[in-house]
Structure formats: structure tokens, C-alpha cells
């Protein structure tokens, strides 16, 4: 599946850069959601409950989350909210945020939004748009570094090694 996020024209909002003021007044979230972390201007990572549904099934807990966020006074400042298994990892670095968001989500089933609507076959929502980027049961297991392999590669990249200045 593919998602096109088209934007044109003058800025519509000022992106949030910290969870303070109205943005800090998050409503009570459904069970299993939290903590929330800043991932970048206008972007939040939110921890979510373990995903247990089959492929291509909309998640009722994500729908409940969108309803809860309707009353959030800071939502216009954060138009993108990514639900992840580990919000701290997701928000720690932009690389992590991009990896988690775009390798663990399917636009056909994992994109939600506050007051989502379809008009003339075009999907729309109010802020925030939510991406369900939790690890799904049907995903391949995450890649984990093997410390022995890491040491061998680092040795190859050391001064005098064949991969020096390449890694």
C-alpha cells in the first residue's frame, strides 16, 4: 500500500516543539497507551499496547485513541502521532523514528486520524494523523545485532583495515 501526503500553500499551524501549555494537557488515554515522547517538531511518539490482531484488521484501540484525542487542546501543534511499542526508542533519534514509522506500518490499515472522513474517495482527518507502527504478529522479528559480528566489522573498519573510512 502507498500513502501520499500532499501539502501545499501557506503554513496552517505552528508546529509544537515541546509538550507544554495546552499541548501538555493530554486527555486520559485508553488503557495501554503511554508514555508520550517528542520525536521532532510537530511529531510525537506514543507507546501503545501490544498489537494482537490479524493482518488487515482495523484496531478498535486505535479508534478509541482517536476519539480520546478529539478533546486535546494541543492537537493542532502535533499533526503526526506515531504509536510504537517503544516510544523512547522511536523518539531518541530521527533515524529510529523514520525506521519504526515506515517499516512497521501499512497505510491501508495502520493510518488513523481524528474525525477521519472519506469524501469523493479522498481520505482526510483533523490533526493529529496517527500511524500504528507497533510490531505486528505477522511481521518478521526485529533484527538484533550479534556482538561478535559487530566486533569483526569494527575491526575491518579500523585504521589500516579494508573498510577504513567507509564505515
Which residues make up each language-model segment?
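Charged, compositionally biased interaction regions
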Residues: 1-167
Amino acid at each position: 500500500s502507498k500513502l501520499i501526503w500532499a501539502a501545499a500553500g501557506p503554513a496552517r499551524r505552528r508546529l509544537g516543539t515541546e509538550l507544554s501549555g495546552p499541548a501538555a494537557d493530554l486527555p486520559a488515554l485508553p488503557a495501554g497507551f503511554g508514555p508520550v515522547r517528542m520525536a521532532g517538531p510537530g511529531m510525537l511518539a506514543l507507546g501503545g499496547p501490544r498489537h494482537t490482531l490479524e493482518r488487515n484488521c482495523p484496531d478498535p484501540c486505535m479508534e478509541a485513541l482517536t476519539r480520546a484525542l478529539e478533546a486535546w487542546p494541543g492537537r493542532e501543534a502535533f499533526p503526526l502521532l506515531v504509536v510504537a511499542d517503544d516510544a523512547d526508542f522511536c523518539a531518541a533519534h530521527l533515524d529510529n523514528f523514520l525506521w519504526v514509522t515506515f517499516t512497521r506500518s501499512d497505510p491501508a490499515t495502520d493510518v488513523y486520524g481524528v474525525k477521519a472522513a472519506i469524501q469523493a474517495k479522498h481520505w482526510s482527518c483533523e490533526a493529529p494523523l496517527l500511524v500504528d507502527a507497533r510490531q505486528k504478529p505477522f511481521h518478521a522479528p526485529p533484527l538484533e545485532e550479534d556482538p561478535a559480528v559487530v566486533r569483526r566489522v569494527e575491526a575491518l573498519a579500523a585504521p589500516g583495515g579494508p573498510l577504513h573510512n567507509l564505515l
